[in-house]
């Protein structure tokens, strides 16, 4: 059996997969420092690549021959952080179907006791492939190459506060053009943007909960080039006593929106 040549964000975050005798695929992600956000809380965004890759793969394997798929929407709802001592997470996927435009799969992130800690949903569109679409289907399982560090460090993400925007505090993040954060087409991996958006979007709020945020909702408008640093900007849409909502965007060099996300945070300030 040939060895995998994949060196993307999945192995960088420790994600691995295995093929089961019944044709299904099992995913595993270790619970380590990549689930720590800059404030020291459990980082909800640490689940984003697992959800994007695990659920997106279910859509991808059902695409028409000769086509490639790209994530257009990703939804992640946190139920609770893994129990103390939990060592790994998996995903249970339920493919819902194809409406003629998008393939849709929902699923649950479970800990090593089988307890559900989050739910997710991924929609993808297919398009004429600019790569060897069928060749990637034969990619063998890759070994974990877990990069040490917190989620921001693994994502090569630095944060800075830029003062008040129209709705309040603004936080900006910069993702360095690290090649292992790319998708097979060479652009920023959708799960990486989702993870970074959650980190930056949650950083505009202070609260007492032990998780960074409760929900992440992402729309991908166009490819996010990774030939230079990627800038991610979060600003407040609502900052109440019990919960808040931030909007996170990234733009290309022409100022066009590439992706937009909302991050929802519950917890009293």
Task: Report the location of each language-model feature.
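Residue-level preference for beta-strand/loop junctions
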Residues: 9, 21-23, 68-70, 87, ...
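Preference for bulky hydrophobic residues occupying beta-strand positions
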Residues: 29, 76-77, 107, 173-175, ...
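Hydrophobic beta-strand-centered segment that forms part of the acyl-chain substrate-binding groove
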Residues: 39-42, 55-90, 201-231
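Structured core of small recognition/catalytic domains
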Residues: 172-242, 246-257
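Intrinsic-disorder/low-complexity, polar/charged segments enriched in Ser/Thr/Lys/Arg/Asp/Glu/Gln
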Residues: 24-26, 73, 88-90, 104, ...
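Hot-dog-fold acyl-thioester-processing enzymes
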Residues: 9-12, 23-59, 172-202
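Non-catalytic linker/capping segments at the edges of enzyme domains
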Residues: 1-34, 122-180
């Amino acid at each position: 059996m040939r060895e995998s040549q994949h060196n993307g964000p999945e192995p960088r975050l420790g994600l691995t997969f295995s093929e089961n005798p019944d044709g299904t695929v099992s995913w595993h992600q270790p619970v380590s420092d990549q689930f720590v956000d800059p404030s020291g809380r459990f980082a909800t965004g640490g689940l984003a690549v697992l959800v994007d890759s695990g659920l997106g793969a279910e859509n991808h394997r059902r695409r028409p021959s000769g086509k490639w798929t790209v994530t257009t929407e990703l939804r992640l709802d946190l139920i609770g952080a893994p129990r103390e001592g939990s060592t790994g997470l998996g995903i249970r996927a339920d493919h819902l179907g194809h409406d003629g435009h998008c393939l849709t799969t929902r699923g649950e992130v479970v800990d090593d006791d089988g307890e559900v800690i989050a739910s997710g949903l991924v929609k993808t569109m297919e398009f004429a492939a600019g790569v060897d679409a069928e060749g990637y289907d034969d990619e063998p399982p890759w070994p974990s190459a877990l990069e040490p560090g917190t989620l921001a460090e693994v994502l090569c993400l630095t944060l800075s506060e830029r003062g008040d925007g129209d709705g309040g505090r603004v936080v900006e993040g910069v993702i360095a053009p690290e090649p292992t954060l790319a998708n097979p087409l060479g652009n920023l991996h959708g799960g990486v943007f989702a993870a970074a958006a959650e980190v930056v979007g949650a950083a505009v709020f202070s609260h007492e909960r032990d998780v960074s945020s409760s929900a992440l909702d992402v729309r991908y408008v166009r490819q996010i080039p990774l030939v230079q640093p990627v800038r991610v900007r979060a600003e407040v849409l609502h900052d109440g006593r019990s919960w808040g909502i931030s909007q996170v965007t990234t733009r290309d060099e022409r100022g066009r929106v590439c992706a937009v996300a909302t991050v929802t945070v519950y917890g009293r300030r």
